[in-house]
A protein has these predicted regions:
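RNA-binding basic/glycine-rich loop and surface signature characteristic of RAMP-family CRISPR effectors
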Residues: 1-126, 133-195
């Protein structure tokens, strides 16, 4: 087993949807109980699989086969994946979490989850245009929270089978993975992955 530190940097605003909304926000980002955003491991693993599958198809399986890819990602197998991945958090997450936890307890009500989240995110507003009039369509105002460009997420990737082929597949998939989250075709979600 080999452990690696994985770093994902948001090169543009990034929406990692939580699937939740409220009266103020139509589309919220995933965040912990203190308001710090994170990159869910399951979502990243799915993106890596799609990225690697794209490479296998483009190279006509010259780089690696689809069977090798499915084995590494544990698809159709009882053994599970050939690597484990944890959620990616902000650098020094434990220290930040402990600090926010202390402030939440010491000054209850003064430091809210929303205030913490606001320091890492921004809210984007958009409307749909009415094609006939060229103006905003009635009732089309929509907003979504975006993680700020420049935000870095780090976490641990553990390669279970210590073989060069598996490592190469992951390295290529990470290099090929350039977009995540919503609004990718609107200039959002551009990321850089470093192992």
């Amino acid at each position: 087993m080999k452990k690696f530190t994985l770093e994902v940097t948001a090169l543009s605003p990034l929406h990692l949807g939580a699937g939740k909304a409220d009266v103020v926000i139509d589309a919220e980002v995933v965040h912990d109980e203190y308001g710090m955003p994170y990159f869910p491991a399951k979502r990243l693993k799915g993106l890596l699989y799609e990225s690697a599958l794209e490479l296998a198809e483009i190279s006509d399986e010259a780089l690696f086969t689809e069977a090798e890819l499915k084995e590494l990602f544990g698809q159709g197998q009882q053994d599970g994946a050939g690597f484990t991945l944890e959620n990616l958090y902000l650098p020094h997450y434990e220290e930040l979490r402990d600090g926010w936890s202390y402030l939440h307890k010491k000054y209850n009500g003064l430091f809210r989850e929303q205030d913490v989240l606001d320091s890492y995110t921004d809210i984007r507003f958009q409307t749909m245009l009415d094609k006939e009039t060229g103006t905003a369509a009635d009732g089309s105002l929509h907003n979504m929270r975006m993680v700020d460009a420049g935000t870095v997420f780090t976490g641990e990737l553990e390669l279970i089978a210590d073989d060069k082929k598996s490592l190469r597949i992951l390295e290529l998939a990470l290099k090929n993975l350039r977009y995540a989250g919503a609004k990718r075709n609107r200039g959002c979600g551009h990321i850089q992955c470093i192992l």
